[in-house]
């Protein structure tokens, strides 16, 4: 494959890998970019998602420079942020964080922002930002405790995974479902196609 058609995913997220596979896209390399994800003072959730996706893409691109076979590859990165109003919810790592997230989301509308950034072989950036609005039903103590016991919340933005048990909490969703999972598929495929990646190459090969 032409090096300019090689794709590096700057994320180790199984959900993002699966979503790309759903569109017939298999990255040539998985290269997670480790960056400081701390929000800046008074930073809007939308701005945070955009900035982090850009920083991840740039870092991965820089790390691959001079590496045989990948220095001219396309680099794709994404970051998902969940917010209630302007309050950014954490990627829950401990149960108390997840409990607080679920308490805040209970009966409320919240927004999920995913920034997607593509670094072209010449180093130029292409970005998009997708917003989805959701509302959870009012959660009982039983529901919250049961969900916490499942462990699905661990490492998830906002303390839940919509593609799992928490999908049963959703009363209303406006926008991209795959955005909430972690990668807005329609917009990402469009970004890759515009960047010169052969997104439809595998559709007629039986590899999808």
From Swiss-Prot:
Residue ranges of the region described as Disordered: 28-48
GO cellular component, one term: cytoplasm
GO biological process, one term: nucleotide metabolic process
Recorded catalytic activity of this chain's protein: dTTP + H2O = dTMP + diphosphate + H(+); UTP + H2O = UMP + diphosphate + H(+)
EC number: 3.6.1.9
Site (Important for substrate specificity): 15, 80, 163
Residues at the active site: 79
Annotated organism of origin: Brucella abortus (strain 2308)
Cofactor: a divalent metal cation
Protein name: dTTP/UTP pyrophosphatase
Record-linked NCBIfam families: maf, PRK01441.1
Family annotation (SUPFAM superfamilies): ITPase-like
Cellular localisation: Cytoplasm
Organism superkingdom: Bacteria
Example GO molecular function: dTTP diphosphatase activity
Family, similarity comment: Belongs to the Maf family. YhdE subfamily.
